[in-house]
């Protein structure tokens, strides 16, 4: 246990997580006391992971306030784990909870970045599905990078047996 505590106290970098999915279950239960799931030790591939996310996490998201709360829980979980540098992917699809406003999503992420700036070096990336239209990636990706809130682009999706 002493080694675990020592490792926990060391400063860390998390160079890739999916922001609204990265919160500790304990913090999640503080805000959503009816949550009745445990995170499995492993998933049955990408499809199994997506099934878990849709069934358990996405079910909590009904509004932009819920998305902001999940992102806030994610960043606080990182801070609690002594993460000093966080690169987190913010899925473009979350705009649907912000009345399809990319600007509103950018503003929400920017406010979290500012809120925690003295506690963590937070560098969000905008996440696009690999199946996104190239025009959308260029158009929205440029808006996000030029906002100076986002520092990169995360292109994600099933990678087995597919060209990148």
Per-region residue spans from a language model:
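Metal-cofactor-binding active-site regions of metalloenzymes
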Residues: 1-164
